[in-house]
Design a protein with these regions (language model features):
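C-terminal binding/interaction regions
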Residues: 2-24, 66-127
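N-terminal first-folded block
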Residues: 9-44, 48
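Residue-level detector of alpha-helical recognition elements and their boundaries
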Residues: 33, 52-53, 74, 106
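Short glycine/serine/threonine-rich phosphate/pyrophosphate-binding segments
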Residues: 41, 56, 84
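Short, glycine-rich nucleotide/cofactor-binding loops
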Residues: 45-52, 80
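A short, polar/charged loop-to-alpha-helix boundary motif
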Residues: 49-62
Length: 127
């Protein structure tokens, strides 16, 4: 279960969905995004010989392909310490620079929240 104090229930939901995608598919990362209508899109890392996408970029692509106009929030469950610049850029492209990106460990605990517009991995971290 995703247990992070002071986490909004809707944010807790996307962290839980991201964690489930990671575990269910046995991939390095799971991600989920929530669009402007509250719909969620969940994905895992794509690692094919001809196509490589992070879980977060895949979730953003799924949102775009489904007609989302904006994002309210994004979450990634990973062993990495921060969301990559490329991942934040994808979130920023659809949601804008103020869109929060929650970074959680494999246990589901949110380690940090960073703005999609943050210029560097650690510059705008909180949590």
């Amino acid at each position: 279960m995703t247990e992070t104090p002071d986490l909004d229930p809707e944010d807790r939901k996307i962290v839980t969905l991201a964690r489930s995608a990671r575990a269910r598919n046995g991939v390095p990362e799971g991600a989920a995004v929530r669009d402007e209508t509250g719909r969620t899109y969940v994905a895992g890392t794509v690692a094919l010989d001809s196509l490589r996408l992070s879980a977060l970029r895949t979730a953003v692509a799924m949102a775009v392909a489904s007609g989302a106009k904006s994002l309210e929030a994004a979450a990634v469950v990973t062993e990495a310490e921060a969301a990559s610049e490329e991942d934040r850029a994808a979130v920023r492209d659809l949601g804008g620079p103020g869109t929060p990106v929650l970074v959680a460990g494999p246990d589901g605990a949110v380690r940090a929240t960073v703005s999609a517009g943050c210029p560097r991995s650690y510059a705008c971290l909180s949590g």
